[in-house]
Amino acid sequence: VISYGLAAVLSLFLAEVKEEGKERMSVKAFCGSLRQTFTDKRLFLLLLGVAFLNETHQTVTVFLNQLLYVRAGMSNALIGYLYIVVTIVGMSCIFSAAVTKKTGRVFLIRACYLTAAAVCLLLAFGRNGWGAAMGIMVLRFAFSLFAPLQTQLQNERIMMVERATALSINAVIIDSVGVGTNLIYGALAEKSLTAALVSGAALCAVGLVFIERGMKYV
């Protein structure tokens, strides 16, 4: 995770072959986008809220899920089949626009965050293997509906012409937050899987507060 974060940061400084004038404009645009991101507290809260749900979903559905399955006594073959099913559930992102249109943006965001928090709590204190599998699928489904919406929220918040640069900076910030949350999850999981999952529920709750405060100004 740390290597991915460092790679994302370093990629921003890769030099491209272009005319000197255009290069100076690109550097100026980058610095302007960077300054705007760190001085816009509302945008920063929005990115923090997005990062908390992103990383909780990633950690629980990719790493902690295996510990949950093993704790429930599932075989390696069954774990592999469940991984395939969860991957297929991730394709539900194609329904995000339709669901958002019917329920409204705010309702869907709240539902996704609260569902993620509830799933983390159920996984933390549950011991049933199939219950864990269903929880993982529900978490993947909720995040898949939210994923396209978070991109839309970021786009609406960007005020600069260099939209691609601003989105890249947003991605770096989200990934950097992810490095910190993954260190927390890893440290807690080594001591207690329950503690790691409870912290995931807490981050989802805090993330909802952050993203709602950021959305008020989108």
Where are these regions (language model features)?
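Symmetry-related core transmembrane helices of the 12-TM Major Facilitator Superfamily/SLC fold
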Residues: 1-13, 196-213
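Transmembrane alpha-helix termini and helix-breaking/packing motifs in multi-pass membrane transporters
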Residues: 1, 66-73, 98, 178-200
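Juxtamembrane intracellular "pre-TM" segments in multi-pass secondary transporters
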Residues: 15-49
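Helix-loop boundary and gating motifs at the non-cytosolic
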Residues: 42-86
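Transmembrane alpha-helices of Major Facilitator/SLC transporters
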Residues: 79-102
